[in-house]
Amino acid sequence: MEGKIIFICFLVVLLTLPELISSEVIRKEIPYKKRKFPYKSECRKACATAFTGGDESRIKDVKPGFFKCSCYYSSG
């Protein structure tokens, strides 16, 4: 019984490992000249255009800053 539990745990870890590796989140900043503190929606569009070819579904999070946007997006 104990061997089966260890095997199942090993199998679950093995199956989830490729997804964790392939979904690396990258953080980059881009300048935003139109507004001193841009809205999140403006940052999301700017990040999608700059890093993912317009694909907003790959943008995980954005954080507006002083004339900049911090972009968190998935590589794959």
From Swiss-Prot:
Name used for this protein in its record: Kappa-scoloptoxin(15)-Ssd3a
Main location: secreted
Signal peptide from the UniProt entry: 1-23
Keywords attached to this entry: Disulfide bond, Ion channel impairing toxin, Potassium channel impairing toxin, Secreted, Signal, Toxin, Voltage-gated potassium channel impairing toxin
Modifications the protein undergoes after translation, according to the UniProt entry: Contains 2 disulfide bonds.
Tissue distribution of the protein: Expressed by the venom gland.
Protein family per UniProt: Belongs to the scoloptoxin-15 family.
Subcellular location: Secreted
Lineage: Eukaryota, Metazoa, Ecdysozoa, Arthropoda, Myriapoda
Molecular function as annotated in GO: potassium channel regulator activity; toxin activity
Protein role: Acts as a voltage-gated potassium channel inhibitor.
Gene Ontology annotations for the cellular component aspect, listed alphabetically: extracellular region
Keyword Metal-binding in record: no
